[in-house]
């Protein structure tokens, strides 16, 4: 299958596009032009590759999780260790690329939205490196959940704006960042943290994150002597770590691709963020994608234990993969993610982010189904330091509830 997406208008099949007001159209067209010029300039990629090597610490290892594999007794599990990047997650791949692009465009200020805080930290880090002013928009609820990352961003010289609109989470932070961009277009670049938003953002983010899949593909061959794994697994909120892993394999049709969505308390409740399981096409933040919405087209609140996954949409390329049945998207509950979090910590000595724990939880199920002759690559998108206090509180609360039930 020859895969050519997106087309010149930014569509991935029937998803994507550029649904923005006139005030933003100039900015996204300017961004697309600058991005195309950077792609055609070998010095841009050389500089970025050097930064990824020397500053971020790439390439990240592809690690055979022998203990986990033996514990499950199924398919071989290889972890793509994005948690070992500088700043602790995959987000730096995109942030560094976009700040470098903004610098070339002559921009002076950087703005970004963040949920779990990882994209905010990565953007603040890249802005500090390039000596640029930086403001991060973060929902007030997430500011409370991720106090440590808020302090990190401030330490790195960024200003953190707590967003009090709506449900005070990630989608509200995106709205606030877009409003700020409209008001300051001349000297400011907006760094979207996931493969979302109006074209060319989903393409730019995918391209900067595809280093994950390109490395993993070669590393798998070097490690195993085999050509391709049988499956890929990654968590999906907006979907940038997943698209980064999937895209270099999209034409390898023997490789099954699975995105683990946040099912919160369960997809039959109102508390989840399982967009491809329960959503339908709609326009959100400048792009046509699958969205959680009610019968009147109003955007529903997304919910997850993981601040990085509670977004009510998903990147348009994921909607396209789902539509053409190239990838499968599966719901994983908070409870299952917590089990994955504890299991990987216990058997491999690796504490995963709550986001990545959704991928681990599904990988455990899939490994049992596939059996020992098969193998998979799981994207460990980030480390769990930021989540340890939240997990401790949740497990203690759950234990107290169980104690009351038995009393």
UniProtKB/Swiss-Prot annotation:
Keyword Thylakoid: no
N6-(pyridoxal phosphate)lysine PTM sites in chain numbering: 91
Enzyme's top EC category: lyase
UniProt key word Amino-acid biosynthesis: yes
One Gene Ontology cellular component annotation held by this UniProt entry: cytoplasm
Alphabetical list of Pfam families matching this protein: PALP
Alphabetical keyword list: Amino-acid biosynthesis, Aromatic amino acid biosynthesis, Lyase, Pyridoxal phosphate, Tryptophan biosynthesis
Assembly information from the UniProt record: Tetramer of two alpha and two beta chains.
Name of the protein this chain belongs to: Tryptophan synthase beta chain
Encoding gene, per UniProt annotation: trpB
